[in-house]
Amino acid sequence: MADRYWVGGAGTWDATTTTNWSATSGGAGGASAPTSADNVIFNTLSNATAYAVTVGTNANAQDITIAGPAVGNVTITSGATAVINCYGSWTSAATGVVFTTTSGAIINFLATTTGKTITTNNVTLGAMAVILSGVGGEWSLGSAFTITANFTVTSGTFTTTASNYALNALRLLSSSVNVRSISFNASIITVSGPTAVDFTTTTNLTFNAGTSTLIGTNSSSTLAGGAQTFYNVTFAATVSGTTTIIGANTFNVLTQAAISAAGLRFVLLSANQTIATLTLSSGASAVTRTFVVSNTIGT
């Protein structure tokens, strides 16, 4: 294992380019490109002023630490084919770091040991999809985490921790047969995509909702819960549309917000649900109604 420090300002981070890598902080460039065993560090000696790093395909690292230059920001630019493979922990600073991301970019978290953290200090990673897939890996949030792409747990253990950090993503996905565990503690989980949650295949999944609140904001939210137990779930869209719940799930509190203008809101159920408290809101007039329906005619 070695440390690789970014130097020289603007450049490309991929599996082969060596121009901007140094074996020492603020040292000469030309060191070997980081591998899965090497720690990657961006710091105040990476450049004196603002600069941009373009992420290519298979930018590899063990731990990744990103801080800004002495003046201005480092902008991490990830196009649609950009891939970062992180085999350890991720830490990016609250200031001095900006992520510019195109849909299609991916961060793979590939650790196979426990004790890894993901800390972005409330700075959004944008449209960077996140996939946790290291067999035996464990990742804990070290701050609130926001992306506008999918957050996927394929293998390993993910927790928002007892600090109850918020998670914001387009979709929350974990539909596979791999051994995996998800714990939400008392966090607020907000998903904005039409498929809010997809736990369709729950083989080898351990899901602990804790006392969390899951919020779906899309006008056509689908929760494919895989017959799991959730705590508080709110479908927050206030426009016409259909909320779909798939699987025989269990809820502590299930809430459907009222629509705010003329139209209809349908709550479509594919199976029996077990709900301790159900709150169905509708508008103040006959043209703003909420209907609960089955996806099977006659039931």
Mark where each language-model region is.
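Extracellular beta-sheet-rich ligand-binding/adhesion modules
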Residues: 1-299
